[in-house]
Amino acid sequence: AIKIDELSKYCKENKIKAIGMSDTSNLCGSLEFSEQISKSKTQPIIGSQIKFKFNDIIGSLPIIAKNSEGYKELINLSSKSFLENTNLEEPHCNIELLFKCSENLIILSGGINNLSGSLFQKDRLDELEKLYFSLNKNSGDNFYIEIQRHGDVNEKNFESFNLSISKKVNAPIIATNEVYY
């Protein structure tokens, strides 16, 4: 785990221009992160891994605010994920809600433990392809297919799939790393 003050110091020492943080299901750490990182003259990038329902699967998608309007949309999505589920299901939004408010958001496909990874591991590749096409179509140029390398046995095959499908979907690849603070 990385402490935010240590991360801020690292950013300053290494003249890092921007760094992002993505909370899980909420934005509770975004204020502290933004304040600390800004002290190092580094641009904070705020995101959240919000759960969405696609067909019958519920899983997270990393969402990043492009600007202040995007930050408001993140707050809205996070709040609705908790407020609009009246039964005992885990907090989530329907994927169509994301499509309606994606203009000021960057959407990542997620790793092996996210919504897309769940579809991949269940061998529901046609549905995963439809999800990627829908995310790309409804977000303009703001959808990125994610690859990660954490040593998970399924990541290598998932990476190969994502590299291949990115050309078909016409979505760029982004390499990310899950770090916890």
For the regions a language model picked out, list residue spans one by one.
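Phosphodiester-processing cores and adjacent nucleic acid-binding clamps
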Residues: 1-181
